[in-house]
């Protein structure tokens, strides 16, 4: 209940947040090193209980959305089902493939994705290409394009994000800050990007907006409490 309360306090609709009778909420244990980089151990908990039937119950909400964003912290078959529902209603589908998939993602899922936002590890696992330099980055991105995903936003940490679509790639540099904790940086980037795209910002501007939000997050300790407000990000 405390998780739902914390979401409600910041104006997030929790109508479709259910309660599992089988297990506790998912937990992530995060270790942060002296440079601010982190390593994360995850216990999925109730995340694993999200079923395609739960998506069906929320179909009306999905159909009325401008976009849907998903990760891989819930069962892949549920993610794929949500993508199909969104596609049926003409809703943009965005996938942040985190945690990095241990098994190949279903071709049917990737075919329903409009925008994918992987980091280096995730891009390697999805594409099957070892990334060692800029040339191998492009090979990995092209392999993902070939799987049916038209837009790839390859996040590069402190370097920024590489946006590739329609055969062209552009690096959108990050804002330079002194990081203390990179926890929630990727989630903040994805959330801010979705806000920007839902407001019809051009892609480059949307990524700049997301980069700024993430750059603020890494200057603070913690996860939810490190995420900036809209007033802090607007520029």
What residues fall within each predicted segment?
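Anion (oxyanion) recognition and catalysis
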Residues: 8, 87, 145
């Amino acid at each position: 209940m405390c998780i739902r309360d914390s979401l409600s306090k910041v104006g997030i609709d929790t109508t479709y947040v259910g309660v599992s009778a089988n297990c506790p909420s998912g937990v992530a244990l995060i270790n942060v090193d002296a440079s601010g980089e982190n390593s994360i151990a995850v216990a999925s908990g109730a995340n694993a209980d999200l079923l395609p039937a739960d998506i069906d119950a929320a179909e009306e909400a999905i159909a009325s959305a401008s976009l849907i964003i998903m990760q891989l912290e819930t069962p892949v078959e549920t993610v794929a089902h949500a993508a199909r529902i969104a596609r049926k209603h003409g809703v943009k589908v965005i996938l942040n493939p985190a945690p990095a998939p241990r098994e190949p993602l279903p071709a049917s899922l990737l075919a329903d994705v409009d925008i994918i936002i992987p980091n280096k590890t995730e891009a390697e696992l999805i594409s099957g290409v070892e990334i060692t330099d800029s040339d191998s980055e492009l090979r990995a991105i092209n392999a993902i394009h070939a799987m049916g995903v038209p837009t790839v936003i390859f996040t590069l940490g402190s370097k920024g994000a590489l946006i590739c679509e329609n055969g062209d790639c552009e690096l959108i540099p990050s804002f330079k800050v002194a990081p203390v904790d990179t926890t929630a940086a990727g989630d903040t980037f994805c959330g801010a990007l979705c806000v920007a795209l839902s407001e019809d910002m051009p892609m480059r501007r949307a990524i700049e907006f997301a980069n700024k939000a993430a750059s603020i997050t890494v200057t603070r300790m913690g996860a939810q409490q490190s995420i900036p407000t809209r007033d802090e990000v607007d520029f």
